Amino acid sequence: MMLKVIQQPHFVGERVIALGSFDGVHRGHESLLRTAKRLSGETGAPLRICTFNRHPLEVLTPDKPPEMLSSIPEKARRMAFLEADEIELIPFDRQMADMEPEQFLETLRSMVKVKAIVAGWNYSFGRKGRGNAELLTEDGKKHGYQVEIVPPAKTAEGTVISSSLIRQMLSDGQAEQAAQLLGYSYTMTGTVHSPKAAKGENVLDIQMWKRKALPADGTYSCLLETGTQTHGAMLHTCATLQPGSFKRAEIYLLNDRTEEIGRKVRVTLVSLIRKSEGLAGKQLREKLLEDREQARKMFDMA
């Protein structure tokens, strides 16, 4: 399904609106979007997801911008899978940060005829986060649209599913646990960057978005998707690979194939093989070859 991405909105008529940051588009977000999709079906109005074009903390705390589970293209891909019709990227700047919540809602209403708004239980908006579920509900009553506040999604143990918890799991190397909360295996998209690929070696240097949350330093079994083909591989993440303007990781191929420099690839995390042991030089290279053989066994390629 194709998702329409809107960056310069104009009045388009009736819409059901889903509000949120949707980082990672995890199981909690999925619950919210399915509620919004149900309302879209009931009202006949298309579903528009309204989210900011960047995380508010990029503006509010520019020295400490947060790592993200998903870039805008990754987010849009997942939302299309969940059958959203449109995603509107609202520019977030200092002026937006200082906007009163009532004005924010007025701006939304000026762009569409709102049939319903769906938001999460802890969604806040407007100056100092003053906008909340109560204010949304009052605005809906005043202007004649339906409001649904979606309760938190929880694990079987009762833990609230959140983007921050998933980031924490990834930072501890818990790939499989993070996948359970996401509802899918964590993915990273990037570009083949290293000349190693041109030399026919079985190691690819992948360059990724600088804000992308990577799993803890170590090695992981993964799937490497290039176009229409998917192959088992091994991911190696290490702090020494990270320059300032982008993030990098190494992909150890498990067969004799290679990839061209500049090719777009998609890496899907499967499971942790080994956390970093602080090795370097020859010891690290030998250990990585051992890890590669372990990955081959995981994919039954030994």
Predicted regions and their residues:
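Phosphate/ribose-recognition catalytic cores of enzymes acting on nucleotide-derived substrates
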Residues: 193-302
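A glycine-rich helix N-cap at a beta->alpha junction
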Residues: 74-88
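Residue-level signal for inorganic ion chemistry
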Residues: 26, 79, 117, 178, ...
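N-terminal catalytic cores of NTP/NDP-binding nucleotidyl/phosphoryl-transfer enzymes
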Residues: 8-71
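Glycine-rich, Lys/Arg-enriched anion-binding loops that position phosphate/diphosphate groups
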Residues: 140-236
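Glycine-rich, highly charged phosphate/nucleotide-binding loops
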Residues: 67-75, 98-105
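Contiguous mid-protein beta-loop-alpha structural module that forms a pocket-lining wall or clamp
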Residues: 90, 94-177
